[in-house]
Amino acid sequence: LKKKEAKEKITQLLETVNLTDAAHKKLGAFSGGMKQRALIAQALLNEPKILILDEPTAGLDPKERIKIRNFISEIAEDKIVLISTHVVSDIEFIAKEIILLKRGKLVSHDTCQNLVNEIANKVVEMEIEKEELKYFQDNYRVSNLYHNDDKIVVRLVTDNPPENHKITIANPTLEDLYLYIFEQGM
């Protein structure tokens, strides 16, 4: 990039990643989230055709996470963006296609919706007694729980739902799929 073009691009990218006010600060004085945003801006400076991002929203507060996630979606229109992350919501909102790797091996590759559909009928919700919670946490993949009066509603990701409880089939999410694939053997 030529100097003038680089200056303009830097100004634009700093505004995009919400670092305009910190433009003259040393990088060492930045918080973790600020450093993350600065690295994303730096990676985009030469307008690469392929962009590889590792945990791009790690350490960001929810407002900044959404802003960066939306920004990544925008730039993905005209470039290939590969994201490695454990932040499932980032993938749900950004990705057209998802590649799941486990121990370096390809587990699955498809659209978010098709992957989630693979575990249809494997996600259930049910009410349990408070005393039963530890049993379910020790023996099932519990993806969520909340208190409902004197009971607890648990969301399980399982091939074998308990037979002695009234269960409701729930719509699976990408987070449920993550638990199903990466927490097998629980």
Describe the predicted segments one by one.
Residues 26-30:
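Conserved ABC ATPase signature
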